[in-house]
């Protein structure tokens, strides 16, 4: 029996480091958070897409000022406090890369592939992400909440210049999709392929990246104007130029996801030890 208790204590000590970061976070747009009906709608959607208790999540309210600080010089849009509806949930215990669920009944512009591109530019390729809103929304401003959710879950900040580069990339994607009339996911594929090639060649020069944009767009049968090709190249170049600032965040992300994965196995061992303890005590009671 003593060995069983010691085993449980050792396993509990092994999992204790993960509590420096939650691994599970939710952000609510301030408009949604201030309206109980709207917030309940969002929570119902989140509950239907996770087996975890929402009360266990680290939560934060995303304000208009936070969104504007990142996006206003990129999009030219200024959001008021009654316009921030989008909400995001991030769970880092998901261990199969990244999975993004977008509530298509509410988020009507930005797709899961577009969010995936922006997150990759932010050093994020792991986790389970859910994005929704209580009313129809473009989803562009939601990126601020998604990134904030990752910061809460990871326990580390994403540099502001990285957030701005990711926001510019997402906004450019939506603009190009709108201007060309192409399927948004096809434009997201274009961005993904260009980024992959730019990363492969370690390119940061917009002129060099523009050549890649033109070639890949032609392969995908996407007709771009010279200005559009330049706009895409500039956005991806900006993303490439800030990747060096992500070292600390990416290390922390890898650490917490690794700890969570290890924790899953350790919890199984704890349950086994508890079962052994239960069986031992039951045996004493029954005299067997």
Cite the ranges covered by each PLM segment.
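Soluble oligomerization/assembly scaffold segments of membrane-associated complexes
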Residues: 120, 128-220
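Short, charged low-complexity intrinsically disordered segments located at boundaries
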Residues: 72-73, 147-151, 172-183, 221-227, ...
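Hydrophobic, Leu/Ile/Phe/Ala-enriched alpha-helical segments that form helix-helix packing faces
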Residues: 13, 41-50, 118-119, 150, ...
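Short, surface-exposed acidic
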Residues: 50-56, 126-129, 158-160, 206, ...
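C-terminal interaction module
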Residues: 187-288
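Sec-dependent N-terminal signal peptides of Gram-positive bacterial secreted proteins and lipoproteins
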Residues: 1-20, 274-277, 281
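N-terminal Sec/ER secretory leader and immediately downstream segment
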Residues: 21-122
């Amino acid at each position: 029996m003593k060995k069983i208790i010691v085993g449980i204590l050792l396993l509990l000590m092994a999992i204790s480091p993960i509590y420096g970061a939650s691994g599970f976070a939710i952000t609510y747009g301030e408009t949604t958070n201030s309206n109980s009906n709207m917030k309940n709608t969002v929570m119902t959607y989140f509950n239907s897409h996770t087996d975890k208790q929402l009360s266990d999540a680290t939560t934060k309210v995303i304000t208009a000022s936070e969104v504007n600080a990142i996006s206003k010089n990129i999009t030219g849009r200024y959001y008021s406090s009654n316009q921030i509806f989008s909400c995001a949930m991030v769970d880092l215990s998901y261990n199969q890369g990244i999975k993004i669920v977008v509530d298509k009944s509410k988020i009507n512009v930005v797709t899961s592939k577009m969010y995936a591109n922006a997150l990759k530019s932010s050093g994020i390729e792991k986790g389970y992400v859910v994005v929704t809103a209580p009313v129809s929304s473009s989803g562009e401003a939601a990126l601020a909440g998604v990134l904030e959710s990752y910061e809460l879950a990871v326990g580390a900040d994403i540099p502001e210049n990285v957030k701005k580069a990711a926001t510019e990339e997402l906004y450019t994607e939506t603009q190009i999709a709108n201007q060309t009339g192409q399927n948004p996911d096809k434009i997201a594929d274009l961005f993904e392929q260009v980024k992959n090639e730019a990363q492969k060649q370690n390119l940061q020069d917009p002129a060099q990246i523009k050549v890649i944009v033109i070639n890949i767009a032609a392969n995908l049968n996407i007709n771009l104007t010279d200005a559009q090709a330049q706009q895409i190249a500039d956005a991806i170049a900006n993303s490439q130029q800030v990747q060096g600032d992500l070292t600390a965040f990416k290390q922390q992300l890898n650490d917490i996801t690794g700890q969570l994965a290890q924790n899953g196995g350790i919890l199984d061992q704890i349950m086994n030890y508890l079962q052994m303890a239960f069986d031992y005590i039951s045996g004493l009671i029954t005299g067997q």
